[in-house]
Amino acid sequence: MGGGLMQLVAYGAQDIYLSGNPQITFFKVVYRRHTNFSMESIEQTFNGFPNFGKKVTCPISRNGDLIHRIYLQATVTDSIASPGLTKWAGHKLIKSVEVEIGGQRIDKHYADWLHIWNELTQTAGHWDGYKLMVNGTTASQTVAPGATTVSKTMFIPLQFWFCRNPGLALPLIALQYHEVKINLEFGDSADVMGASGASLDSAALYVDYIYLDTDERRRFAQVSHEYLIEQLQFTGDESASSKIKLNFNHPVKELIWVEKASGDGVGEYDTTYDSAKLQLNGHERFTQRTPQYFQLVQPYQHHERVPTTCVLTVDASSIETDEAVMETCTTGGINVYSFALKPEEHQPSGTCNMSRIDNATLNLQGVDTDNTVKVFAVNYNVLRVMSGMGGLAYSN
């Protein structure tokens, strides 16, 4: 008897729990047929001239039935000499961006949030490519001999709920009476280009439209919809203190905070506090923990990536030994506390309803009071679309 057959007949009572009354096979593929659809990325133009420090609005045209991903494409002329395009310039370019339906703001994101979300969720396979998309590196580029400038184009993906999940694509076909707008405030030239007085060569939004087949299109237009969406809450820069009041609402899946010294830009985060704890109505949510718990353990448990910065250094004195190249890693300064098992997924896996908490405070012991602290909360809400209009089921 061959070894494979011997394994096959070595079947006992315990195997009943694994392969008794089987429900699937690994040796016959099963697939499901999907509805007919197509996608197309179409450029949208701003009302107003897009430039550093400006606020512009982009009405989303009704080219298709649903909208999914949105990218900001921006081109700048970068100086080869210093100062030049700064690191993470793509994130810094978007000071804030919000989506508006029928005049109601549904969600708003910020430059720091775009950076934080990338640091926590970007996969290893996409990391280097994403850095090129948003200029997440200070590496020099190959230019023509004698040239003093080089044109650079950045592609910055927006991270609204409908951009990250095709099942939450925004149904324009069901919003006949409400206009969808993207309101964008550009960052300062000094933050993005390293010098004031520069200007954008061009900027536009590219929206991925989804076209549905006749039957599904009719169904989307006629019936009402309820979407469980994610929103970002941010109460503004707080002066660093031992007690920071958290004025948040709705079921929150995670809290994220960063500490910034004066003059720090996007992606430049400080850590001066010795320990932190969260209090809800005067009760400790967890015992006091050190920064390493929030910057390493929590991201490791709940996110795709643990934000760290690693630098390779060469020790010239031991160049012929294995210790010649040393890697030094530090935490990224991004603090996380998750109420959910898997906060990156749309499927709810744990929340804390902050609407039912009268007094929530984040206690930071030993924090430098000259710094500022930004605290973000990711919450669930319900977007209702009916009778050609859309709005939130629960307001603040």
UniProtKB/Swiss-Prot annotation:
Q: What does this protein do?
A: Major protein of the capsid.
Keywords recorded for this protein, A-Z: Capsid protein, Virion
Q: What are the annotated disulfide bridges?
A: none
Where is the protein found, in the record's own terms? Virion
Any Pfam family from its record, for instance, is Capsid_NCLDV
**Source taxonomy lineage?**
Viruses, Varidnaviria, Bamfordvirae, Nucleocytoviricota, Megaviricetes
Family according to the record = Belongs to the NCLDV major capsid protein family.
What organism is the protein native to? Pyramimonas orientalis virus
Gene Ontology molecular function: any one: structural molecule activity
Q: Which GO terms describe its cellular component?
A: viral capsid
InterPro entries per the record?
Capsid_N (IPR031654), MCP_C (IPR007542), MCP_C_sf (IPR038519), VP_dsDNA_II (IPR016112)
Primary location recorded for the protein, binned into one broad class: virion
Segments crossing the lipid bilayer: none
Q: What is this protein called?
A: Major capsid protein
